[in-house]
Amino acid sequence: MRVVFFLVILISNWLCFSQEISTEFVTKIPLDADTFVGVDDLGNIYYLQNNTLHKKEVDKVYSYTNTLLGKITSVDIKNPLKILVFYRDFNTILFLDNRLNELTNPINFLEESIAKNMNAISLSSNNNLWMYSSDDNTLALWNHQSKKTIFTSQPLQFYKENFKPTSIVSSYKEVCIFNNETALFFNEFGAYINNISLNKTDQLHYNNNQLFGVEENTIYQYQNGLSKKVRLSDKDISIKSFYVNKDHLYIFDGSSIFVFKFLKI
């Protein structure tokens, strides 16, 4: 009987441990920023300060600002050679190169007769953009070169009752549209996959088709309907924002970036 009890405890502890992802602390980088955007494959840091986008390399900082388009809503650095900047107040996007020079003229969705209220946008592949508009509460895939809509979903309440999202994140294979309670997933062709429940999550990031989010100051990985806690190697950090790139996790606490390496994902 004691042996059985011991085995139950051992298995329970193993299961709990298996639901965690271990990390090791790498370094701490001071950063004076209003918003930490992320880090690209070369270790360059992107951030917002005074409504200006900055890219910090080892020995140089590039900057971009556009006072005519209002406040920057979001920046997508998935492709560092084609950075997407979204200005929600003016219903406008533009693309920047790796030195933060404009690649395109601003694209105004009202002028393109797409939507009056574009709320969230994320990069896809092949010059496509995932877009959410509160006008009709749908998710759309739009090609910014051909100016054609490739896919439009059903109204999102069709997939989840009373669902009204606040943001979008995507990989090149999948898109996640979410609020702080629910996330809906669609594949690259617009087919609905599933949905998961979240716990007060306001930040999600894809990394190699794996989704990470922060809930109550703890980072989790979501995969196959399960969540795994990311253990920050005994560091107690107030998570203002975070970013995941390959095998590294970057956490911004408002004054510094804490860099961790995943021991196993």
How would you describe each model-predicted region?
Residues 1-25, 265:
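Bacterial Sec-dependent N-terminal signal peptides
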Residues 53-54, 92-93, 137-139, 183-184, ...:
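Structural signal for beta-propeller blades
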Residues 26-32, 63-68, 107-114, 152-161, ...:
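Surface loop/turn motifs at the tips and blade-to-blade linkers of beta-strand repeat domains
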Residues 20-82, 88-90:
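Start-of-domain marker
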Residues 35-48, 81-87, 93, 122-133, ...:
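Short beta-strand elements that form the blades of beta-propeller/WD-repeat-like
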Residues 31-40, 69-77, 114-122, 160-169, ...:
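Repeated scaffold domains used in trafficking and secretory/extracellular systems
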Residues 85-147:
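Surface-exposed, polar helix/loop patches in the mature regions of secreted/periplasmic/lumenal proteins
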Residues 56-60, 97-101, 143-146, 187-191, ...:
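Short loop/turn segments that connect beta-strands within beta-propeller blades
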